[in-house]
Amino acid sequence: MSEEILKENMNEERLRHMIEASEAAELSEYIKENNPIDVAQAAEYLDDEELWKMCSILSSEDIASVLEQADDDLRVRFTYALSNNELLEIFSSMAQDDIADIIGDLTIGRRKTIVNLMKDNDRTEITNLLEYPADTAGGIMTTAYIAIREDLKVIEGLEKIREIGPKIEVIETIFVVNARGQLIGTADLRDILSSDKNILMADITKENFISVGPEMDQEEVAKLVSKYDLKAIPVVNQRMAILGIVTVDDIIDVIVEEYNEDILEMGGVSKEESLDTTLLQSIKLRLPWLLINLITAFMASFTVKVFEGTIAQVVALSSIMTIISGMGGNAGSQTQSILVRQIATDKVDFKRDWKSFVKEIFLGVINGTVNGLITAIIVIILYRNVFLGVITVIAMIGNLVVAGIFGFLVPVILDKFGADPAVSSSIFVTTATDVLGFFIFLGLANIFLPMLI
């Protein structure tokens, strides 16, 4: 058992013991002494009754610290264990973007009730955040940031930072606005601290800044933050007024979420599915992909059926053709994975990246030759037929070239038409390498059949 798993088990056991013993003071101290992330992970293993008891003996501040680090499923379970008034009290210790995420997961009726119970200014901010889809810049932004007028002196800006800084998640980047409230640039906290206190904020403002609109997809926002190494990126409307900011910790969550989603979708599994998903839901989520795979499997089967007569005369073909198609599938997956990753971080332009396409073809020739020769030697030893070995080499080269071509083009074409390459690429690439791999190998065998018998 790894040290990390052992630590998780110890946290879970200790947390459960304190809850069962109703040790409120010890539990509160435990939360303060440990990273809230570790506490949230331990809380995932609690049943609903234990979670309710945990909420009943903890202060709203302690629950808030755990809620901010909890995953979506645990947050939903927490809301079931808390009354509306208890939630409102907890929200007073949480960031607005986290509050919006939690409220967004509530039933419509309860969501309206809680929003209506909020103070006017909080209600306005949360309502604005809830307007945007969860996977957009507006959906993940926070309205807690520091904006300072350009006509204020640096010393006045410092006073404002001292006043509201403790409530703000990111204070390293200060946003500078004009008299109309429009964003005109940013200022680093380091520059503010080291500058003459009597100069204007406008004098230390960097006007070359990156901003995004509230409708931008969270994955595109993550690319910008990564590309320009930002700690926070402002979200602005058409008038360049700041609506909020997306912080780097939210971007990390986005990257993890998108990575997990891509891994699941490449396997034909929906991001909505988990171990707790009901049997009926799992069937609905998985069956469509399995049916698509069934169709592609029949395509490969029909290709083999065309050459049934050839296979009947040279039985060895049946064992070798699976090697050819399998190697093609693996090679195609390699190229496809590289392209999907490249598309996720930067757009791929065939006119610009044609050299990479040619490289994949040559790579298919070289890898096909090496693997084909190794396979051919084994085939010749086993079946004592040199011509069968030669056909194996040619087919291996051909199928790995096919794998390189389709592994490159399929993700690019899918992305061009607005489809997610991570979801559908593998089906088309595997189908191509299976069907064409069988066709090349069995077609050659049919042509040179007299030499194989």
Predicted regions and their residues:
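Active-site His/Glu-centered metal-binding helix of metallohydrolases
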Residues: 435-436
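Hydrophobic packing positions in regular secondary-structure scaffolds
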Residues: 1-266
